[in-house]
Amino acid sequence: MSANELTSGDFTESGEPFKLFAEWLKEAEASEPNDPNAVALATVDEDGLPNVRMVLLKGFDDDGFVFYTNFESQKGREILGQRKAAMCFHWKSLRRQVRLRGPVEIVSDAEADAYFKTRARGSRIGAWASKQSRPLESRFALEKAVAEYTARYALGEIPRPAHWSGFRIRPTSIEFWKDQAFRLHDRIEFRRPSPVGAWEKVRMYP
């Protein structure tokens, strides 16, 4: 089945970007070989130099797109400094792409705590042991830190580190791209002046 056959109707007629994203993600979950929620996250440092890396989307709704990270990591520091970010989803099996960008807010402690509890125990230990984005003298040093925190939290719940939480991108732009023959692709961008503004839909040249 081709990507064009998967979605009923013409996606360019949609006026609801979050609903359209939900439909596309659901189809990606059925067709991508792994991690359909993987997304390229772009941030910029204090000199305006961009950095990009893959993260996993952990939730989305009409308020925005959520992912979790160490706030002392490179991306954490850059987002806290600029409070803006961009994402790009690419589903090769569907020949589709979604780009979005906008201001970023920190999720509530309750949201972060609830998600942290769902993580594998080893991942929760790792959140304590890893000084993310800092130089590491050896693999042994990391394994030693993991062993120390494993012993410290051998019994009971593992608390969420204060430096580990989530960010929510509240998009002011969401673009849906779909491959078409001869590079005459379909591109639809939804724009709004602020995260609470009304959406304007614009068809873009490919």
Curated annotation (Swiss-Prot):
> What is the recorded name of this protein?
Pyridoxine/pyridoxamine 5'-phosphate oxidase
What is the recorded function of this protein according to its Swiss-Prot or TrEMBL entry? Catalyzes the oxidation of either pyridoxine 5'-phosphate (PNP) or pyridoxamine 5'-phosphate (PMP) into pyridoxal 5'-phosphate (PLP).
Q: Which cofactor does it need?
A: FMN
Record gene name: pdxH
State the Pfam families in the record: PNP_phzG_C (PF10590), PNPOx_N (PF01243)
**Which ranges of the sequence are coiled-coil?**
none
Its assembly, as annotated, is: Homodimer.
Textual note on the cofactor: Binds 1 FMN per subunit.
Return the broad EC class: oxidoreductase
Q: Which reaction does it catalyse?
A: pyridoxamine 5'-phosphate + O2 + H2O = pyridoxal 5'-phosphate + H2O2 + NH4(+); pyridoxine 5'-phosphate + O2 = pyridoxal 5'-phosphate + H2O2
Binding, substrate: K58, Y115, R119, S123, R183, L184, H185
Q: Does the keyword Transferase apply?
A: no
Q: Signal peptide span per the entry?
A: none
Keyword tags: Flavoprotein, FMN, Oxidoreductase, Pyridoxine biosynthesis
